[in-house]
Amino acid sequence: MPNEARIKKRLTNKALHYLGRYASTTARLRQVLHKFAKRKLETAEPKDIEDAIEAVIADCQKFGYIDDQNFIDSRIRAGRIAGRSERQITQKLLQAGIDREMAQTSLNAHREGYAQAEWLAALIHIRKKRLGCYGKERDPDPEAYQKQMAKLARAGFGLDIIKQILSIDSIEEAENLETEYRHNMPL
């Protein structure tokens, strides 16, 4: 049976190795350490493992290896740049183990320039997915238009933004709007 110091040492090594490879949240690191302990430290007492995991997580937070707020901020910026809607960004944060309240608080803080951010995300999305003015058909029939609207709605964009984005006539106009929003948006 491994002693407490050895348990903590192995968990610390695993945490540092994992954090050296991936940006992580506290919740995700906790999952990784529990999974590791279940596989590699099966003879240890569950209470010792739990205490060691909490100590390792506290050490990682103290030294700045994991910082949930920094993780959230970087994911919000990356999501905006990638053309994700606020709903998609929220879902990604929840999947990463961030609690809903913390995610909403951070999104509210980043909401300055929100309309422009959603517009920019929608413009990037239609460019990447070849929808609207970037699509094959410049004036799609009503059925194709409905399909494009559905794709944007599934991506988490609101109906008002969808209609305005799909009403853009030319690629040049879309690119000009994207450039304007990029320069005016606080990321």
Predicted segments with their positions:
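An alpha-helical, amphipathic repeat domain used for nucleic-acid recognition
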Residues: M1-L187
